[in-house]
Amino acid sequence: LGKKSHAMKATASVHEWCGQAFMQVNNREDLEVKIHSYFESTADKELQLNQALMENEVWNLLRINPESELLNVEKMIPSLEYLRLRHRETKAYPVDITQKSVKDTLITTFDYTSLDRTLKIKQEAKFPYEILSWEESITDNGKTKTTSAKRLESMRSAYWNQNKPEFSPLRDSLQLPQYGK
């Protein structure tokens, strides 16, 4: 991981009530974007973007070094999921990034004023800088809607081998709902 390197690839698959869309960004000399969508206006689109930080990659950057050069970023490509669900143009948008320490946590805020959108990521202030929660707020027509998530438990396991019903009790230890309940 070099100081100036970016994620090699980011993808998003979004299913809406009336169709689905898939988006992929490949990091080459420029960012190569491919969009495949159910919607005619955005179906099978390809575009090139100048190198820019992607919100999809900041989650990893925060885990590696939360006090990196992230705070110097002035424009960023919002999450691919957000762009698809809100039908926004794929480009880097102005962003104000701030960090503050609260007890043993670090809260990083990404404020996209031109999009009326804010993302807050709360993580441990010490290594391994685990992400504890996040919150996304979007204002539309004067109403703010907030989505949030909080880690309840964690476990290290070979999850790719634990995909049979006999492993369902592991969901309890992670405080996840059981299937069919």
Predicted regions and their residues:
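Acidic, serine/threonine-rich low-complexity disordered tracts
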Residues: 1-30, 68-181
